[in-house]
Amino acid sequence: MPLDVAALRELGFGDADEREVRVDERERVVGRVARLDRGWSTVVGSGAAARGGDGAVRVRNIGADVAVGDWVVLDPRCERVARVLPR
């Protein structure tokens, strides 16, 4: 699913954030961490609605230092946070 910048803008995604998303990540889910629960993140944003049905997807935080409000790129193969965009 291509990066849906318009949907992300509603969540506060700016031009600087968009520049941080690498070309090879533009087909992945990019979103904002809305909630943290014991090693899991609830992410809302581009592509999350298609995967989670309600506009959010729950993924593992394994190896990622995430906080609520962070922009993240998800790894679709194993449903985890692949990368946290710079804060």
Language-model-detected regions and their locations in the chain:
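N-terminal accessory targeting/assembly segments
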Residues: M1-R87
